[in-house]
Swiss-Prot record:
Acetylation found in the keyword field: no
The protein's name in its UniProt record: Uncharacterized protein MJECL10
UniProt cross-references to SUPFAM superfamilies, sorted A to Z: P-loop containing nucleoside triphosphate hydrolases (SSF52540)
InterPro entries: AAA_GajA/Old/RecF-like, Bact_Antivir_Def_Nuclease, P-loop_NTPase
Highest taxon of the lineage: Archaea
Keywords: Plasmid
Keyword Cell membrane: no
Naturally occurring in which organism (per UniProt): Methanocaldococcus jannaschii (strain ATCC 43067 / DSM 2661 / JAL-1 / JCM 10045 / NBRC 100440)
Lineage of the species this protein comes from: Archaea, Methanobacteriati, Methanobacteriota, Methanomada group, Methanococci
Length: 219
């Protein structure tokens, strides 16, 4: 499992996780552009990435948060209401993921379980950050048969600033082909810029612009 970050405005410096899955409390500091989490089996490596994925999705709104939460619950193995309950460490009522960015921006994601029953949307979720905040609620009806079939047949292009990749992602219909196409397009663009710079060193990039109802490449 891994996470790709796209178009990030600022690098994550610190992540603080409380009461998430098997993690009572964990703080990772001095993070870099590329971070590798290593450890023994059942050492909560996947839980760290899940917590980060939930936080990053929450930064982009409630809808994406629910989408990523569903993917996390499904790839772990959906076993009903208890799958949601098991997000919380040892019967705790609240879990928290806090992140500080290199530019000193700070954001905090909180999930609260109001009681042992998940009926009537008893899980509250809230994001507080320097730039945007929101709150919402959800219940145990997150995973249904139609959703399970749709997630395996969808190969949508990435619309967010990050991508959470699990074994389920890799077996989605058309996913590998989609990633290959994106990589090929990137390589073609890089090759074109390199060739142009041989003749015109001042060239920085290529951008498509529409002019007189026609698309042209602006250098």
């Amino acid at each position: 499992m891994h996470i790709h970050l796209f178009r990030c405005q600022c690098m994550i410096e610190t992540i603080h996780i409380k009461n998430f899955r098997g993690i009572r409390e964990l703080k990772l500091e001095n993070l870099g552009q590329i971070n590798i989490i290593a450890g023994k089996n059942n050492a909560s490596k996947s839980s760290i990435l899940e917590a980060l994925a939930l936080f990053l999705s929450a930064k982009e709104g409630f809808s994406l948060f629910i989408k990523i939460l569903r993917e996390i619950l499904l790839w772990r193995g959906w076993y009903g209401e208890k799958s949601i309950y098991d997000l919380f460490y040892k019967n705790s009522k609240e879990l928290e993921v806090s992140v500080k960015f290199l530019n000193q921006d700070f954001a905090n994601l909180t999930l609260k379980n109001s009681n042992q029953s998940f009926a009537n949307k008893n899980i509250a979720v809230e994001l507080k950050s320097d730039k945007n905040s929101w709150s919402g609620r959800f219940d145990s009806h997150l995973i249904h048969p139609d959703y399970i079939s749709s997630i395996l047949t969808s190969a949508e292009a990435t619309q967010s600033n990050f991508e959470f990749i699990t074994s389920l992602t890799l077996i989605k219909f058309g996913y590998i082909e989609s990633i290959y196409s994106q990589a090929y397009e990137t390589q073609v663009l890089q090759d074109a810029i390199r060739l142009l710079r041989e003749a015109y060193p001042e060239v920085k990039s290529l951008s498509p612009l529409q002019k007189y109802n026609k698309w042209i490449i602006h250098v």
